[in-house]
């Protein structure tokens, strides 16, 4: 094996990855639900949970430094959410809209009190029409907390207060309930939180950048239970009426898309029922319903829940609920992507630039792998030294393939050469490369993150294709500097075009990934020269000009 054949191996791995990615996007089987129970139900099965449909009421606006919400006083649902710190597109001044209610698309965070005596129970009539003292709430300068109380009094005189509390700089919305029983019998109520969304995503709301090499992150529902940290639940599964129905303590339910998460977190010590539902008209839902609570006559009880509505910032989500940070979809290489991101974030805390942080992490990764790289080049050098003996053996044995194989293995053993030694470092490097790919595609911190000069978004492709061309040039240089024993004309042609093929591949890759590969190639050039000098001293390498 020599460096040029290694390029061929890498290319084959890339092609395999692209084919696998396309297949996964098309087929993507449902993850195994080991701790859940699924039931087939009819459309609109959220009603079976005592969860109401939306209604018409007065719309009030709530604005903090990072969030702008629209709340419908009919039920107190959040019908719109704007993320003020995250523009819709790189050059846009319009904030990204996470929650939306239009005739074409619905994405809402519903909540309330259901159960036997809950005002949101459809059996008790229309949803409660809350009273509020003003139509706009704005977090003032110097104010750290914004409180929005909604009040409803039923026919029996029972007072239900639903209070939204938002903090400066936060995407966690506390939703509290106060139930004041003015009747002569106990009130039985349960809290619920439900996320509903149109399964088909309009093009205008798609956060995927598109292109041949775009990593399509998971969009759908997810949940966490006491027995399972994180489970995905596809929208298509809900549309097929294969619905989730599981009871658990703690946990959360969520809806995910690239970079952003919405999640309900129950705040109680009892058991909660997690469910999904096909609401009809292409709208799906995931939600929870808490264990019933009895409020005695003349008593007041308080209940709590938390809504996360915003960017998928891992450390902040983990502080809201255990394992909520797992909603950042790093795919099947999450166990590499997560520590890689933590290291990248640590470096960024010093440098303040994600591009330079990627460069530093490249040096760290390649430094750690230097012993393997050295072993790779040593193995390839030994293989080249054995070529005359191997060629003589092949001429001597003719077409006897079995004896050729036996004597070749004996030769490798005698010379202490591992024929696969040149491949092992490549096998190690590919998962790291792909993990970085996942990380760049799923981490909101890298969305619209600028580097230098013309690179204004490391998560998107280079708009002028300069970085891929530079990357191809570094590959070409490595190829020219590497000795070869390849004599087959077809292999020689393939290897000659390899830098061009890779350049085409990388045209649509995230800029941050191309930066990583360019720096990695530059490190390879440096390490290559250092290793060759050592091999020359051992008589395993010659500075003779590479034959073209």
Swiss-Prot record:
Keywords recorded for this protein, A-Z: Cell inner membrane, Cell membrane, Chaperone, Membrane, Protein transport, Transmembrane, Transmembrane helix, Transport
Keyword Acetylation belongs to the record: no
Biased composition (Low complexity): 29-41
Record-linked Pfam families: 60KD_IMP, YidC_periplas
GO MF annotation: an example: membrane insertase activity
CDD domains on file: 5TM_YidC_Alb3, EcYidC-like_peri
Annotated stretches, region: Disordered: 28-52
Origin: domain of life: Bacteria
Keyword DNA-binding tagged: no
Residue ranges crossing the lipid bilayer per the database entry: 6-26, 345-365, 420-440, 458-478, 499-519
Membrane topology: Multi-pass membrane protein
Location of the protein in the cell: Cell inner membrane
Any single GO CC term annotated in Swiss-Prot or TrEMBL for this entry: plasma membrane
GO-annotated biological processes: protein insertion into membrane; protein transport
Homology family: Belongs to the OXA1/ALB3/YidC family. Type 1 subfamily.
Function: Required for the insertion and/or proper folding and/or complex formation of integral membrane proteins into the membrane. Involved in integration of membrane proteins that insert both dependently and independently of the Sec translocase complex, as well as at least some lipoproteins. Aids folding of multispanning membrane proteins.
Assembly and oligomerization: Interacts with the Sec translocase complex via SecD. Specifically interacts with transmembrane segments of nascent integral membrane proteins during membrane integration.
Name under which the protein is recorded: Membrane protein insertase YidC
Protein's organism: Klebsiella pneumoniae subsp. pneumoniae (strain ATCC 700721 / MGH 78578)
Gene designation: yidC
């Amino acid at each position: 094996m020599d460096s040029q054949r290694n390029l061929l191996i890498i290319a084959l791995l890339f092609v395999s990855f692209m084919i696998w990615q396309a297949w996964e996007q098309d087929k993507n089987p449902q993850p195994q639900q080991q701790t859940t129970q699924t039931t087939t139900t009819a459309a609109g099965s959220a009603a079976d949970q005592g969860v109401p449909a939306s209604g018409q009421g007065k719309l009030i606006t709530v604005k903090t430094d990072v969030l702008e919400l629209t709340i419908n006083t009919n039920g107190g649902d959040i019908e719109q959410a704007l993320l003020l710190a995250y523009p819709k597109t790189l050059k846009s001044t319009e904030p990204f809209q996470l929650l939306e209610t239009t005739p074409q698309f619905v994405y809402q965070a519903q909540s309330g009190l259901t159960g036997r005596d809950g005002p949101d129970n459809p059996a008790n009539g229309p949803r409660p029409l809350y009273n509020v003292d003003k139509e706009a709430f704005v977090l003032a300068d110097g104010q750290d907390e914004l409180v929005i109380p909604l009040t409803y009094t039923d026919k029996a005189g029972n007072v239900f207060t639903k209070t939204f509390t938002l903090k400066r700089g936060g995407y966690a919305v506390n939703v509290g309930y106060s139930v004041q029983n003015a009747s002569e019998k106990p009130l039985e109520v349960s809290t619920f939180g439900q996320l509903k969304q149109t399964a088909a995503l309009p093009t205008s709301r798609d956060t995927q950048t598109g292109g041949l090499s775009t990593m399509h992150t998971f969009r759908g529902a997810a949940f966490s239970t006491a027995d399972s940290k994180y489970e995905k639940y596809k929208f298509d599964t809900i549309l097929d009426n294969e619905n989730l129905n599981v009871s658990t303590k703690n946990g959360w339910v969520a809806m995910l898309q690239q970079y952003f998460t919405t999640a309900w977190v129950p705040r109680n010590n009892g058991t909660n029922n997690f469910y999904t539902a096909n609401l009809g008209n292409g709208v799906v839902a995931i939600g929870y319903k808490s264990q019933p609570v009895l409020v005695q006559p003349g008593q007041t009880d308080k209940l709590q829940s938390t809504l996360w509505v915003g960017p998928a910032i891992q450390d902040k989500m983990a502080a809201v609920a255990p394992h909520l940070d797992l909603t950042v979809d790093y795919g099947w290489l999450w166990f590499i992507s997560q520590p890689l991101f933590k290291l990248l974030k640590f470096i960024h805390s010093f440098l303040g630039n994600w591009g330079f942080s990627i460069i530093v992490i490249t040096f760290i990764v390649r430094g750690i792998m230097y012993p393997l790289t050295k072993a790779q080049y040593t193995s390839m050098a030994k293989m080249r030294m054995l070529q005359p003996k191997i060629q003589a053996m092949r001429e001597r044995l003719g077409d006897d393939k079995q004896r050729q194989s036996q004597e070749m293995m004996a030769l490798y053993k005698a010379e202490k050469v591992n024929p696969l030694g040149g491949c092992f470092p490549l096998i190690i490097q590919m998962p790291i490369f792909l993990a970085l790919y996942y990380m760049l595609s799923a981490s909101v911190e890298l969305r619209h993150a600028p580097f230098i000069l013309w690179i204004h978004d490391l998560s998107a492709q280079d708009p002028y294709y300069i970085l891929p061309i530079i990357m191809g040039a570094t590959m070409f240089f490595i190829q020219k500097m590497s000795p070869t024993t390849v004599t087959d004309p077809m292999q020689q042609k393939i290897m000659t075009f390899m830098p061009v093929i890779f350049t085409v591949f990388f045209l649509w890759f995230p800029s941050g990934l191309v930066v990583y590969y360019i720096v990695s190639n530059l490190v390879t050039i440096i390490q290559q020269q250092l290793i060759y000098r050592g091999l020359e001293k051992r008589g395993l390498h010659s500075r003779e000009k590479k034959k073209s």
